[in-house]
Amino acid sequence: MLMRSDPFRELDRFAHQVLGTAARPAVMPMDAWRQGEEFVVEFDLPGIDADSLDIDIERNVVTVRAERPALDPNREMLATERPRGVFSRQLVLGENLDTDKIQASYSEGVLSLHIPVAEKAKPRKIAVGRGDGHHAVAEGAAQREVINA
């Protein structure tokens, strides 16, 4: 049987209400990993309306905000365990990521960001010119000859 009033739960609920405000948002759990030529970040946001999601980028800092509205105060609650209010998370991205091509999607309570590696950060070959009309392309310890026609 559920207790109508549990002082510890009331204190916990109060703490979530106070900490989950726009001035001091609650943190959202996330996972991040590299997948081929991009980084993927997933945030758990169950029960969040997609219209309340806000993603901003300034230089190399991505800020993700979401809000779960407060419950009707006239409702007699028997349990309140889900956090309400504002959620926020900031990620500082490395210079090797292309912040202009970030893609976001929201499905089944999970917000996914796909952040591609910048072209300038991808491995590439550098041609070394020689005076005899040939170019040598450095490839690790090996060398490949390129002949100009």
Swiss-Prot record:
InterPro entries: A-crystallin/Hsp20_dom, HSP20-like_chaperone, Small_HSP. Gene3D superfamilies: 2.60.40.790. It comes from the Bacteria. Residues 21-131 form the sHSP domain. SUPFAM superfamilies: HSP20-like chaperones. It holds the Pfam family HSP20. PANTHER family: HEAT-SHOCK PROTEIN 20 FAMILY MEMBER (PTHR11527). Not known. This protein is one of the major immune reactive proteins in mycobacteria. Belongs to the small heat shock protein (HSP20) family. This is 18 kDa antigen 1. It comes from Mycobacterium intracellulare.
